[in-house]
From Swiss-Prot:
A GO cellular-component term linked to this record: mitochondrial inner membrane
HAMAP family: SLC25A38 (MF_03064)
Disulfide bonds: none
Entry-linked InterPro entries: Hem25/SLC25A38, Mitochondrial_sb/sol_carrier, Mt_carrier_dom_sf
Gene Ontology process terms (BP): erythrocyte differentiation; glycine import into mitochondrion
Name of protein: Mitochondrial glycine transporter
Family to which the UniProt record says this protein belongs: Belongs to the mitochondrial carrier (TC 2.A.29) family. SLC25A38 subfamily.
Keywords noted in UniProt: Membrane, Mitochondrion, Mitochondrion inner membrane, Repeat, Transmembrane, Transmembrane helix, Transport
Classification of source organism: Eukaryota, Metazoa, Chordata, Craniata, Vertebrata
Role played: Mitochondrial glycine transporter that imports glycine into the mitochondrial matrix. Plays an important role in providing glycine for the first enzymatic step in heme biosynthesis, the condensation of glycine with succinyl-CoA to produce 5-aminolevulinate (ALA) in the mitochondrial matrix. Required during erythropoiesis.
Amino acid sequence: MGVSAEPRSLSVAGAGLASPVIEKARSALLQSQDVEDTVETLMLHPVIKAFLCGSISGTCSTLLFQPLDLLKTRLQALQPSDLGPRRVGMLAVFLKVVRTESLLGLWKGMSPSIVRCVPGVGIYFGTLYSSKQYFLRGHPPTALESVILGMGSRSVAGVCMSPITVIKTRYESGTYSYESIYAALRSIYCSEGHRGLFRGLTATLLRDAPFSGLYLMFYSQTRTAVLHGTAQLDAALIPLINFSCGIFAGVLASLVTQPADVIKTHMQLSPVKFQWIGQAATLIFKNHGLRGFFHGSVPRALRRTLMAAMAWTVYEEMMARMGLKS
């Protein structure tokens, strides 16, 4: 009896001593499992990663190239009386803005631009990624598939962000003055109804959807040709190749869609005068001739080209670091 009791007491004591160690090990194991579960959960949502990568890339490009968008809007908003006998160029508008509104005036409309571009670019890349995964099943898109994917993804983003696009255009024109984005939304809704928040949406889609479709086609086809044409390529050169392919694709896509951008701007700035696309196109041609459809083409081409090239370069790099194929 005495001998059997002693080991029992030792075993109980040993269990008491071991229990903190076991609890710590169990706690560490649970924490390890929690981390693994968290990582696994994140891996189950690649579309969210694509959205975040797109939003970050959109933020960087918007901050850098906002002045070009403002100059483009000001050039397109010029009336025939403002032009006079001499043609007003981007440099003249730039100097006027700096002289009358200071250097920071070039970033007027930054708030709606950020509100539009950050989620807008995120929605575009998220929709594009999910569409690729669903329809392509991992194989690279053909030229036609790239056009369709780009147009569809941009249309989704364009419809979602249309009210902010209207506000951004009016901010940049210098004609309208709103206290805040909310005040602008309320003012437009009260004076023009819900249609005012989607003013120029058709022209916007006619501009953005073909641009994104053509851009994605030129970008993906050029990038594939360049990367496949080199047997061994330094990894440090890939961002430069992505950026160069983006520049090439942006120039071509910008020139094709420039007339739709001019029509969109006039419809959003003067909704009473330019009520539908055909009327807007007729009045622009009557007042400015064929050249009127290409007002602001230089700053727009620079901005859209550089912005898209940077957005895609940042997006490709971030997706690669997250272990996802863009």
